[in-house]
UniProtKB/Swiss-Prot annotation:
It is an enzyme of class 3 (hydrolase). It comes from the Bacteria. Belongs to the SMP-30/CGR1 family. This is Lactonase drp35. It comes from Staphylococcus epidermidis (strain ATCC 12228 / FDA PCI 1200). It holds the Pfam family SGL. Its cofactor is Ca(2+). Keywords: Calcium, Cytoplasm, Hydrolase, Metal-binding. Its main location: cytoplasm. Its EC number is 3.1.1.-. Binds 2 Ca(2+) ions per subunit. Ca(2+) 1 binds at E46, D136, N183, D234, S235. The active site is at D234 (proton donor).
Length: 325
């Protein structure tokens, strides 16, 4: 029989939240505002990227639709459906093509293909027939080569890694291997530091590179931050001050780090304490501004709120990467 006179734990304060913030509770914190509703359905939105004309492209992973959003009118159109299963990221090449990473069967059939903004003229860049990668995300460097993340593995089975593909798309060089579900990836403004999120072990990697872009500098591979909670860090981007913005999947927020990997701020989705809009996956800046767009969905809340883009102002203007150079 319970003794009512014993000290008793109660749900008060932070413990009342569906996704409590403990270690980062003292950080500068803002709450995002609704920007565009993509769908009334719960879609796994991902892959935010802008073209040279400032139009936003994104996708939903499980149905494979590629969307385009006009920031001026907030009009949403479906451009095409991915020819490959489970697309996970879009990056715009300087020539205007969309490079689309796809996860395939989440085991051995992922890859990257390039296409036009209408989904025409498909070109295999990393073929799912010739590799065992499960490719989640990529980032171009100024030479036109790119780094990509291999999304394979589990917390106790680190099969994933990070690789570099030369500008001619013929040579693939490993950067780091034996990590678990490599996910988001970003490159510093001087291209000397590569950031990688490792989802199922809740880690942030900071990789200092030598001038060749593939050799890790002495003592250059570090883990400056360990995240807490379920599920973990997802896609990321940088601003022009080299701050890193990391979406926290399953937590309804984005954490912001300075160029040394120290947390300096966070962005919350409305309703997160009640378990709403928790699947934050990708932050991205509107070109030439400090306005940050964040995609999320309400699948964990029976899709009540659908699939949304939210917005806030970041610390600095977004960094205009390869497609704008």
């Amino acid at each position: 029989m319970a003794n009512q006179k014993l000290p008793t734990l109660k749900y008060t304060g932070k413990s009342e939240s569906a996704v409590p913030i403990v270690s980062e509770s003292e950080l500068q914190t803002v709450t995002a505002e609704p920007w565009v509703k993509i769908s009334d359905k719960g879609l796994q939105l991902e892959g935010l990227n802008f073209n040279r004309e400032g139009q936003l492209f994104l996708l939903d992973v499980f149905e494979g639709n590629i969307f385009k959003v006009n920031p001026a009118t907030k009009e949403v159109t479906t451009k095409f459906q991915s020819v490959k299963d489970n697309p996970a990221a879009i990056k715009v090449h300087k020539d205007g093509r969309l490079f689309i990473c796809y996860l395939g069967d989440f085991k051995t059939t992922g890859g990257i293909f390039a296409t036009t903004e209408k989904g025409e003229q498909i070109e295999e860049i990393i073929s799912d027939l010739n590799t065992e990668y499960c490719i989640d995300d990529m980032v171009f460097d100024s030479k036109g080569g790119f780094y990509f993340t291999d999304f394979r593995g589990y917390s106790t089975q680190p099969l994933g890694g990070v690789y570099y593909v030369d500008p001619d798309f013929k040579t693939v060089t490993p950067i780091i291997q034996n990590i678990s579900v490599a996910n988001g990836i970003a490159l510093s403004t001087d291209e000397k530091v590569l950031w990688v999120t490792e989802t199922t072990t809740n880690r942030l990697h900071r990789i200092a590179l030598e001038n060749d872009g593939v050799t890790i500098a002495p003592f250059g591979a570090t883990i400056p931050y360990y995240f807490t909670g379920h599920e973990g860090p997802d896609s990321c981007c940088i601003d022009s001050d080299d701050n890193l913005y990391v979406a926290m999947y399953g937590q309804g927020r984005v954490l912001v780090f300075n160029k040394r990997g120290y947390p300096i701020g966070q962005i919350l989705m409305p309703g997160r304490d009640d378990g709403k809009m928790l699947r934050t996956t990708h932050p991205q800046f509107i070109p030439g501004t400090n306005q940050l767009i964040i995609c999320t969905n309400d699948i964990e809340n029976h899709s009540e709120g659908g699939s949304m883009l939210y917005t806030v102002n970041g610390f600095a203007k977004g960094y205009e990467s390869y497609q704008f150079q």
